[in-house]
């Protein structure tokens, strides 16, 4: 963590899971592409050109930005009045490519782990946008490994009760 840029909520949302896994001697992998590589793609018109050779190993072997439901959902989210910033279409396309780069790397990492650990259940934690409705990472993992049973569990705060659940299972919680 000393050389990484973990999410601001790492200590509260991720560290307890990582520590639990360590305590129980369960394997943990960092499935995602490093943030600076996704940022490079977003800032460089969806291109990986210019990434130093030593970091290329951290990129997915294959990446694609699919048309359809995921793209529509992404563009709607990023174009909504609540979006953090307004972006011109070309920039939005590059940011979508960076999002897909993350999905591809996570799917490849999970698939590689599944190949190396036959019959082991895998718990993958990601932001809900990456797997809601079996899109994003879930969709790409299902394409890489159609024989895997992928189940999406969506945590929702009780005050979001009216929202349509986007997972196979929903865990309702109250924020303290």
Predicted regions and their residues:
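Compositional signal for N-terminal targeting/processing segments
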Residues: 1-176
């Amino acid at each position: 963590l000393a050389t990484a840029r973990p999410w601001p909520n790492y200590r509260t949302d991720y560290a307890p899971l990582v520590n639990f896994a360590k305590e129980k001697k369960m394997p943990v992998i960092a499935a995602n592409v490093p943030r600076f590589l996704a940022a490079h793609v977003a800032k460089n018109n969806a291109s990986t050109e210019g990434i130093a050779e030593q970091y290329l190993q951290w990129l997915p072997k294959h990446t694609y930005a699919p048309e359809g439901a995921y793209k529509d959902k992404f563009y709607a989210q990023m174009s909504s009045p609540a979006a953090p910033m307004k972006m011109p279409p070309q920039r939005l396309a590059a940011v979508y490519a960076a999002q897909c780069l993350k999905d591809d790397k996570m799917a490849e990492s999970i698939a590689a782990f599944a190949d190396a650990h036959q019959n082991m259940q895998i718990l993958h934690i990601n932001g809900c946008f990456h797997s809601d409705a079996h899109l994003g990472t879930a969709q790409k993992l299902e394409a890489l490994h159609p024989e895997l049973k992928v189940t999406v569990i969506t945590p929702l705060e009780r005050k979001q009760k009216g929202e349509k659940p986007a997972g196979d299972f929903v865990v309702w919680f109250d924020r303290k």
